[in-house]
């Protein structure tokens, strides 16, 4: 397993590669036993993340592998379908995957997402427009949503999707 780090305005991002695929993207420390280095996958990932952070790239196209429970994998797949600049509630994701009463479980699955940004769990918010949690911290979530063009204060009052969820 090889990792690299990159600095962003929100903090340091760690990218981990194994067998030609990204297996972790997070604000956490590298896993024990991982060696710091560079290879084609990590170099391309850094290039794409830099373009994303500059607002030039809206969809990351990188090889990845993530493993979780069947429920987690369904949640993560649903999160990858949320378009750039849009949000969904935990309840909406729960209904989308066929478990309408599992909003909290969706939140837990999002928290355990090993591939921040590739599986954009920052795009999931609470039903009343509150941000909810984020494994990398609320500062990261706020920064990522603002980067994608979300006005976090105006959205609560003017976003038709959020307004419709309240009624």
Where are these regions (language model features)?
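Basic nucleic-acid-binding alpha-helical/helix-turn surface characteristic of O6-alkylguanine DNA
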Residues: 1-101, 147-167
